Amino acid sequence: KNKKIKFTNSSTIENIPLRKNKIDLVIDCTGSFKKFDNISKYFKEGVKKVLISAPVHDDRALNLVYGINSYLLKNSDLDIITGASCTTNCLAPIIKVIEENLGIIRGSITTIHNSTNSQTILDNPGTDIRRSRSAFNSLIPTSTGSARAISLIYPNLKGKLDGYAVRVPVLNSSLTDCVFDLKKS
């Protein structure tokens, strides 16, 4: 009752009044701070825990998919927790069933994904000719970190999965296609 939750908006962590407002938990959904050096700025401002809505590829972060490896949170002393990515959350339950029952030798992942804010809305010159195409009018093949992110959830699959993405001009949807070479048929 009558509790206030403060929201802030800043492109730099140092400009957020975290210590002044005695903030001990930050939920970061910016997608901007995915490396430990950037995330650690929160701790310098007095924050105790950071929950990030994207994978963090660092041993100092615990990447979780609820219902798959979320039990690890109970005994973890790590201060950076991630909710992985939308594609990782889609893949992890599928991979759990297949890996536990059939075993995965290697695999390929394709994610058909809606446009993201890293894309341009109009064709323009750029260093990546594919990402320079209009997100409104193009099917854009690009990279995905999903195969690498899955190995954070399933370390035994590190180096066994590869993947790519196709960005498509839809508002909010995703489809993931997986092909696996299995130990058992």
Residue locations for each model-derived region?
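Active-site-lining helix/loop region of Rossmann-like oxidoreductase modules
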Residues: 76, 92-185
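N-terminal Rossmann-like NAD(P) cofactor-binding subdomain of oxidoreductases
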Residues: 1-121, 125-132
